[in-house]
Amino acid sequence: MKSILLLVSFVFIAFSYCEESDVNQIDHVDMGKFSPEEVKFRYLEINGIKMRLAEMGNGPLVLLAHGWPESWYSWRHQLVGLSKAGFRVIAPDMRGYGGTDAPSEVNQYDINHLTADMIGILDALGEKTASIVGHDWGAPVATYSALFYPERFTKLVIMSVPYNGRQDQNPIEGMKAVFQDNFFYILYHNEPDGVAEKEYDKDPRDLISKFYQSPGSQTKSPKITDPKRSAGGFLPRIGEPEGLPDWFTPKDLDYVVGQFEESGFRGGVNYYRNIERNWKLTKDLKDHKIKVPTLFIAGSRDMVIGGASKEMLQSSMKEAIPLLEEVILFPNIGHWVQQEAPEETNKILISFLNESN
């Protein structure tokens, strides 16, 4: 199990700068059962790119950073729940996603730029501090933002991707040693010539409908069962789902698919192409610790944690995060924790965010 957690830490390995910007435009989005007027978009010039932010509420700022393949929309339930609890909630389309710009250069997606985007949001909104919550790829972005700017980020919530400090081994080399000539999606994302995004861009609906499933969802047999990379790409290795889970409606699917039909997948895949670069950029950080109150949340059946228990996760993270207050594992919940268990997630978040430091 320790090797699984170390492999997870390989994936996400920060220091940066940002530009202050003005609000250019505000519009609204129809969220079905949520009133359209409840959610507004802001378009801000931040750190050299235009970013789209979904915003709700007034009060202390909470910044929500999504992962792959997601958008601001993955936080739709938290926007409503946290804003009603008295928080100003911002959920950006991260760099390369949705309505946010997608620079062409791969190194524009390294951890320096990603954390600079988070600081840039605070500066553009005139906010001195915020709590930051990150899921999937948003977890390391949130983690490193809090690691380098504890005076700006007063609380940290890590979702799905544990943090146990910088590892000694080059993460990409570690994955190559483990998987060799077998398929592994992170190595696939690091292949040259954009092979991964070319596959995904052909059919965004196929990817999203296959990924956004619950543990135990019924699927047909995958078209590719050979573990060798030479047997093919990613999507044929995932069985066709029999339907959508209750927490992800056809309208949700249409919205998320539309975001990727518009932006493409290259921006999100470029995060993975910076894993080795991020590891090199953070070479002097081995002994740095996160010094803000921190909470970890995941589904007990999230494949990222590989079946790790609450105690194992606490033990693996406590040295790098001395102020880790609690590890929360929701039973029988998978990777998309804030969407699969929105009420439970909101309850835990609100309680943690309301605590005095």
What is each of the regions a protein language model found here?
Residues 10-17:
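Hydrophobic h-region of N-terminal signal peptides that target proteins for export
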Residues 49-101:
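Conserved HGGG/HGGXW glycine-rich cap/lid loop of the alpha/beta-hydrolase fold
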Residues 25-39, 50-51, 97-133, 137-325:
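Flexible "cap/lid" subdomain of the alpha/beta-hydrolase fold that forms the substrate-access gate
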Residues 40-46:
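Short acidic-hydrophobic surface loop/beta-edge motif
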Residues 63, 90-92, 135, 159, ...:
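The conserved SAM/SAH-binding core of class I Rossmann-like methyltransferase domains
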Residues 57, 125-128, 356:
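Glycine-rich phosphate-binding loop signature in dinucleotide/nucleotide-binding domains
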Residues 2-7:
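Sec-dependent signal peptide recognition
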Residues 323-357:
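Catalytic active-site module of serine/aspartate enzymes centered on a nucleophile-bearing elbow/loop
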